[in-house]
Design a protein with these regions (language model features):
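FIC/Doc superfamily catalytic core
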Residues: 1-202
Length: 202
């Protein structure tokens, strides 16, 4: 799901084949994206949600075959749609502050995961892979709260509501606060839970 959001269309059948070690046809970039995502999601239980070093490692694993700067913050300015991300010179400080908040905040973990996801996308700390790593890290945070969340296909739900996902980010940026994005992501988490319940009883 998270790869399709970013425009990788290998599809479930080919991705399953890659997991099983079979050869599949696809561009080098598509295959590298899938292999990186598989490796990163396999380590979901090992990542410590409040450790910046673990997020950098996750980015390296996710993007290693795609990006020469995988695992390092960007050194260039970036613009995403109408959003101009913070200057690269302050990215490290912003990320340290974000992780300090993540570690010390008394907010409920569901809220923390959504707030972190939005703030991470606002900072846009990497030159590529920000969407993927932001969604992965929200899963890491939720999984640390309750392992049941590792079973929830939140990324697949977001994929199905992709337009609304980007609009929620845009609305939060325009308002200079994360409420629209938090509400959207909580709704996606609820839909994921409802899907699991439906599958269990049907």
């Amino acid at each position: 799901g998270t790869l399709e959001i970013e425009g990788n269309f290998l599809g479930e059948e080919k991705i399953t084949a890659i997991i099983e070690g079979k050869r599949v046809l696809g561009t080098v970039k598509e295959l590298a994206e899938v292999q990186g995502a598989i490796k990163a999601y396999e380590k979901l239980d090992e990542f410590r949600y409040s450790e910046l070093a673990d997020l950098l490692l996750a980015h390296k694993i996710l993007m290693d075959e795609i990006l020469t700067t995988a695992g390092s913050f960007r050194s260039v300015n970036v613009k995403v749609g109408e959003h101009i991300a913070p200057k690269p010179s302050i990215v490290n400080e912003l990320m340290i502050n974000l992780f300090s908040w993540l570690k010390n905040s008394d907010e409920h973990m569901l809220l923390k995961s959504c707030i972190f996801h939005y703030e991470f996308e606002f900072i846009h700390p990497f030159s590529d892979g920000n969407g993927r790593i932001g969604r992965l890290w929200q899963s890491v945070i939720l999984n640390s709260f309750n392992p049941i969340f590792s079973l929830l296909p939140t990324e697949s739900i977001v994929r199905d509501y992709q337009e609304e996902y980007y609009k929620a980010i845009e609305d939060s940026t325009q308002l200079a606060e994360s409420t629209p994005f938090i509400e959207f992501m909580l709704e996606m988490i609820l839909k994921s839970i409802q899907n699991i319940i439906f599958l269990c009883f049907h």
